[in-house]
């Protein structure tokens, strides 16, 4: 691939350096330089523009983006207009699923109820999109919010409040369990083994009772915990994020082959749980540690497909197209590639699939697992 992968050799993954002035590459604002993995940075639009637009592959193929965020964070605004500006660069997006990101929580009231503000906020965005004034895509036709499932039985009224606030769009919860003992790895969970706690499973039972799904998020080292959760709660609808949480920095740097083997074994075992689906994507430099930001320009779709193909094809082989669904993870993955090239890369990886398999991967599985019309 053009550019480089940071490390001692092309298979080694280490913490990347930042873009330098003397290379002619643009700098990001002070405090925003992408000088380490595991962090979210504001996308550098000038750097992204260094890659010429690509022709759109299979432009008529309907796409449901199963994982994106909407936020104003550290001065970075990514709301309906910004998302639709990316969408307008190509591909046939028909609808999308919003994933919780601690956006617009209520400023007061009981702490456990404050995340309802995010659902209220996104439902307003979704209503704007549903008006048709902003075009044909139906943004946030599914909403995945946050509720603390370790509240156990006490989480039910919170879930019911989300349902009321969601205007018929609320589909489930993401309660992240990703945790690593090394402090360099950014954790979403405040404690290890969150998914093994009896209180969490009691909360999941309440979620399942209400017909809602759980977006699970854990690192590949924790997939045994997700397997245990899926087996213990066979009626739960679990959707695993980001190809199963690959890591390639910190203690995992320079160990790509070792990590791949361990990840593949766990993903294959996870796929034996029929109540689990797998999202395909979310592997930009933040987690898998491909050092795209050290390149003079973003990768092409061919380059990205070459890097991601082993991971995505492994997931599809294990789960099958009817339990896999593509995701943009924007604006997080926009740190390393533009919208049009990202979806071109997914289409290149799926090029050998049948028409029915492509339908499942790009929209059909999403309609089923998120109960979208």
Question: Predicted regions: what is each one?
Answer:
Residues 12-14, 24-62, 78-86, 94-95, ...:
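Mid-to-C-terminal alpha-helical segments outside catalytic/metal-binding sites
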Residues 31-51, 110-222, 228-231, 244, ...:
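Active-site gating/metal-coordination segments in enzymes
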């Amino acid at each position: 691939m053009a550019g480089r992968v940071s490390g001692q050799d092309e298979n080694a993954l280490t913490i990347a350096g930042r873009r330098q002035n003397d290379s002619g590459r643009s700098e990001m604002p002070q405090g925003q330089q992408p000088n380490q993995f595991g962090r979210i940075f504001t996308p550098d639009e000038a750097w992204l523009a260094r890659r010429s637009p690509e022709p759109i592959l299979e432009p008529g193929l309907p796409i449901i983006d199963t994982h994106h965020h909407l936020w104003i964070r550290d001065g970075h605004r990514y709301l309906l207009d910004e998302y639709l500006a990316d969408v307008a660069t190509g591909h046939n997006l028909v609808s999308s699923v919003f994933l919780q990101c601690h956006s617009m929580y209520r400023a007061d009231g009981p702490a456990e109820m404050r995340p309802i503000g995010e659902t209220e906020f996104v439902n307003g965005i979704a209503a704007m999109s549903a008006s048709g004034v902003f075009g044909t895509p139906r943004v946030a036709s599914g909403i995945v919010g946050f509720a603390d499932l370790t509240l156990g039985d006490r989480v039910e009224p919170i879930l019911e409040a989300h349902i009321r606030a969601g205007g018929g769009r609320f589909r489930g919860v993401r309660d992240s369990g990703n945790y690593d003992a090394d402090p360099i790895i950014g954790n979403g969970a405040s404690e290890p083994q969150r998914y093994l706690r009896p209180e969490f499973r009691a909360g999941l039972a309440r979620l399942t009772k209400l017909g809602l799904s759980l977006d699970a998020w854990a690192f590949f080292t924790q997939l045994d915990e997700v397997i245990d959760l899926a087996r213990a709660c066979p009626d739960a609808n679990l959707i695993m994020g980001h190809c199963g949480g690959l890591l390639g920095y910190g203690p995992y740097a320079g160990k790509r082959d070792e990590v791949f083997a361990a990840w593949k074994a766990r993903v294959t075992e996870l796929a034996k749980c029929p109540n689990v689906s797998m999202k395909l994507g979310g592997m930009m430099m933040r987690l898998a540690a491909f050092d795209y930001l050290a390149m003079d320009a973003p990768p092409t779709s061919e380059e990205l497909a070459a890097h991601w193909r082993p991971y995505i094809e492994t997931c599809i082989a294990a789960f099958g197209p009817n339990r896999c669904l593509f995701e943009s993870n924007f604006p997080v993955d926009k740190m390393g590639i533009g919208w049009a090239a990202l979806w071109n890369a997914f289409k290149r990886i799926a090029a050998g699939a049948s028409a029915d398999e492509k339908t499942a991967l790009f929209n059909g599985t999403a309609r089923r697992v998120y109960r979208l019309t």
